[in-house]
Amino acid sequence: MKPTYCGYAAIIGRPNVGKSTLLNQLLEQKISITSRKPQTTRYQILGVKTFKDIQVIYVDTPGLHAGTERTINRYMNRTARGALRDVDAIVFVIEPHWESQDAWVLDNLKEIETPVFLVINKVDKIKNRAELLPLIEKVSSLYAFQKITPLSAKTGDQVGTLEQAVHQLMPESPFYFPPEQVTDRSDQFMASEIIREKLMRLLGQEIPYSLAVTLIEFRKEEKIIRISAVIWVEKKSQKGIVIGKGGERLKRVGTNARLDMEKWFGKRVFLQLWVKVKSGWADNERLLRELGFEE
């Protein structure tokens, strides 16, 4: 029997460098929510890509960040660091410039013996690729990376080059997931994340970090899926902002989320949304566990 190869590759980096966009591009479909706001990803998400005799399980993680003032931030940091355990490869994503937070992430990686690929993302924003040479020289002096790949997760340029390099590090092993499976997350999780993405995209800078979404109903029928969800905020004033004048903003969130869900599930979706206040949830460990955050 022809051997198969299977392993894990963790995607790591500071917030808002395009880790989730890269995962979606590698999988050729969207499983991880994205927005222009940092720390959009809160949970560890597995994305499974099977190509002939090779299966790579990519681990999308929350952005590692030095600021740990809030309990939710500490939870996300622990999630990101936990993803580095027992993986076969690490994909460290940066933008076309080196920041102090990148150095902080790299310090976390230096304690690990796993091979690290450095990805310089968002090169579609650079007119002359020669501008990257000083950065490549700098990062090469900081760490012995397995490979340095400038690419664009947005356009897909050079993503295949990274993928081929990751394939070479996958150990001989049976597949861990059926070839047709693309994520370990449930339909209910995907529905709640789609709602949160639409909120992140429509709201201002501060409110999204005080938001959480939980489902109170998820019922599949023959021709339709019925979903009811609660959007949790920390303050009464935030509730009004989420709902909007005459309920207009909440209606837009619902419409946008429903359309995405219908693409994901392949059938009609009936979606109901409510907004409720749960004061201090982002700093309360018990409430964080209730909302799906893990140690």
Swiss-Prot record:
GO terms for molecular function: GTP binding; GTPase activity; ribosomal small subunit binding; rRNA binding; small ribosomal subunit rRNA binding. Residues 60-63 are annotated as: G3. GO terms for cellular component: cytosol; plasma membrane. It comes from the Bacteria. Its main location: cytoplasm. It is a peripheral membrane protein. Residues 203-279 form the KH type-2 domain. GTP binds at residues 13-20, 60-64, 121-124. GO terms for biological process: ribosomal small subunit assembly. Keywords: Cell inner membrane, Cell membrane, Cytoplasm, GTP-binding, Membrane, Nucleotide-binding, Ribosome biogenesis, RNA-binding, rRNA-binding. Residues 151-153 are annotated as: G5. It holds the Pfam family KH_2. Residues 39-43 are annotated as: G2. Residues 121-124 are annotated as: G4. Residues 13-20 are annotated as: G1. Belongs to the TRAFAC class TrmE-Era-EngA-EngB-Septin-like GTPase superfamily. Era GTPase family. An essential GTPase that binds both GDP and GTP, with rapid nucleotide exchange. Plays a role in 16S rRNA processing and 30S ribosomal subunit biogenesis and possibly also in cell cycle regulation and energy metabolism. PANTHER family: GTPASE ERA, GTPASE ERA, MITOCHONDRIAL. Monomer. This is GTPase Era. It comes from Coxiella burnetii (strain RSA 493 / Nine Mile phase I).
